[in-house]
Amino acid sequence: MHVQAYGAALGYLADTLLGDPGRGHPVAAFGRGAAALERRLWHDHRAWGALHTVACAGGAAALGGLWQAAVRSAGRGARSTDVLGQAVVAWSVLGGTGLAREARAVAAALEAGDLDLARERLPRLCGRDPHRLDAEGVARAVVESVAENTSDAVVGALVWGALAGVPGLAGFRAVNTLDAMVGHRSPRHRRFGWAAARLDDAAGLPGSRLTAALAVLAGPDPRGALRAWRADAGRHPSPNAGPVEAAFAGALGVRLGGTLSYAGRTEHRPVLNAPGRAVRRTDIERAVRLSRRVGLLALAVTGVAGAAGRAVARGGSAGHGRGERNERKAGRGRDEQGGRRGGTGPGERSGPQSGPGPGRGRGARSERRRGFGGGHGRGESGW
């Protein structure tokens, strides 16, 4: 196992036991900074939105790199310090426990028959207009949000942490937050948020596919999950939410999608897993449990994959080093052979010769040939 795997495991454990950091949450601080920069940069143009996205996401990744370097410097390269630094960032980025807590709070309000309270808490999970939703609509919105945020707030972060360490964690969370802030089709953000939405689609792709695959493996109905994923994922307007929501719908045996309302706008989305039944309040808890299983499996998969990738990289580096050493040894061997050939042979005269006899002439010609041949040989051998 390597630093990223240990750090991710400790961060996941901290999120499970402690939940979100609370006051001074880095993601909330990033959101305030991104909103302030948006007020200064906003123009109804894609280029300005791209500048905003690069500045915010790139800045977050750079800060993550600085944090990682500072922790390593403070710990003088100690592995335990590096793991702790990774764990702190993973804890602040992962949101599985907060997601489960908010989903269960809505479920508790529905169980108590308090639809108004359930509607009041729903915006903490998603951007739907809650006042147009009945109890079934609220429950469906929660299940869809649990599915999508399992990918965004848990699995995707673990994937990028395994790939790029602290900069990957910070950068992915920044991209995901920007998409939630500006990556939608409101009049203000239709053009300005285009870059954030496209970057989020690209960054979220590996995590969403892994989430869907793990939902198939961990869900109560693997065949139904796989069937819904194959049949309905491409019908969803989001390339990443589609596979995840479809797989969750099939795994839980419920219908998702349909008519939605966002900020006064009504959207009619295709139904996911049409053979399933309508969502009930009790399906919220089932979705949360599936989300937790998927998160644990993702932690294991990314940890093993990261360790394997590091081992392969080390093996390739070691093999390259061995190849260089072998070539140097071979070169020295060729040089030594050339030197032996260049010495005095048994049929040659070692002392000074008197007169231009036949032996003297053969020796001179032979020395000239050996001198040219030996030098040329050393040049070709790379010395």
Where are these regions (language model features)?
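Short amphipathic, positively biased membrane-proximal segments
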Residues: M1-W383
